């Protein structure tokens, strides 16, 4: 009996942290959510932009068959019908081609994965691969799942089978999230169908998974399923590599379910991160208070989290809430994103949105009939045809390279004016200064950088020989003078050794 207990403990220890490594190619550290993009457009973006600019990877929208909903809202992608790989984003062949092309340029693919539930209960119809479904009888022959494969009144004790009491952990995990048919993940058959789907994606070459609604699943069920996942495709990643798993756990405090229950499995999404930074960069909390940003603010360990300013849900006022900054407020949004990318806390994810009417938060991606529009690229590298593409804003993609260059370097040389002007360095690799105050910043600061002329990667870029924006001269003593107008569209300056005149341009 004792040997069995010891063996079980060893399995738990072996699993802990196994799925927390983002599996980026060397020198890359940031992923971007290309929300509702087609697979063909993602493949092109990997080759023409993400690879050359040092991005680690792409979070893609759920690739499995989903319910067809009138007017095609974005959230139909989060109502599975089967695990067939056919959606508005494209076919399985197009998905396979995209994954292969992105991996060839060192850009990894992370699949948004919906395994807590199927469609909403009630009604019937077909999915994006033509599979029939019936939410009245809980019949999903495309998997197949039947009524036996869902939680019932034996597991869920709310009056209508829906979640109402967020102070009741059992109800949160055993009942229906907004009337979505809740899978019985304690059942081996259900687990096997889910892991077969995830393993198929691994075999196609994905690097990992975002687990949607992880908070609504028991950690033990997730451990059991993830323990049977394949290693990553050895032709791409080498042998013995595990997929990266990051779990959507909305933990704003005050509820019985905490993110810490899931950090032993993989990473968790840190929603408080974006909410708190939003308060600072809207000038609701002094920027000087960021001097101890991270765990000292009551947030989880840096190695346990994926951090972000906004995501596809909370930019629409859905899950997570808290009024995060979004692309609708570009000035503070760029500042907050630059701070996130310059600071060592967490593994960073960017949001890449499409334009939508804020009075219609259900609005789906730019489309022509049932077809998602192509992503078109303007002369200034921004996107057209209804796509916002925050990841293509210069102030953001240049900071992706900044993060790559300074990775592993300690935060040092912190300076602030006690209010809304701050600056800090990352070892001897990079330095950033920001001014959110109501007056100009005019300071000589210690950067920690080697002497030379650096290109500010906020106001411009470095092409390997010259700067298109501001130049900053660092003296032999490491000091440099910074002048930042409080009325600037981008009141910040960032420099790093990969954008130093007289040396090659480096992004990873």
From Swiss-Prot:
Ca(2+) binds at residues 116, 173, 182, 216. Transmembrane segments: none annotated. Binds 1 Ca(2+) ion per subunit. Binds 1 Cl(-) ion per subunit. SUPFAM superfamilies: (Trans)glycosidases, Glycosyl hydrolase domain. Disulfide bonds join 46-102, 156-175, 383-389, 455-467. Chloride binds at residues 210, 311, 349. One of its GO terms (molecular function) is alpha-amylase activity. It catalyses: Endohydrolysis of (1->4)-alpha-D-glucosidic linkages in polysaccharides containing three or more (1->4)-alpha-linked D-glucose units. The record marks 313 as: Transition state stabilizer. The active site is at 212 (nucleophile), 248 (proton donor). Its cofactor is Ca(2+); chloride. One of its GO terms (biological process) is carbohydrate metabolic process. Monomer. Belongs to the glycosyl hydrolase 13 family. This is Alpha-amylase. The lineage of its organism: Eukaryota, Metazoa, Spiralia, Lophotrochozoa, Mollusca.
